[in-house]
């Protein structure tokens, strides 16, 4: 969460560009909740609807070079199930610099986690309606969703503990 806050406040990746990056990952992963939410957020940041449609269709060639490097990497990152080719990551780092590249990676990880939660929730809903998602099981669906529930209070506890003890090891 600290990395996300730092990325958002750092100003190296503006909000519209961050939304474009997240829309590409969401298009690959197919999360309907993230698609809806980030489409609205992208439009609110000034991304034209025509660009949004291209992002959702993964038609990335028309975007300017200063965006297409990150957008094509975002697609590769999602399609490789978070295991990108090191040469592809090196291209992002070389093009944007290490700090901006790390901010881009933070957005990629955040939206991937969001997509996982949304798709897992959909799998659980499908299971309840008698149509379990292929390749999924009740245990993994419940584990992911329950894990997401305890994460915010745990992070709050860690943050409070660090501020009282000054211990950054946790």
Can you name each region flagged by the protein language model?
Residues 1-170:
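Hydrophobic alpha-helical segments
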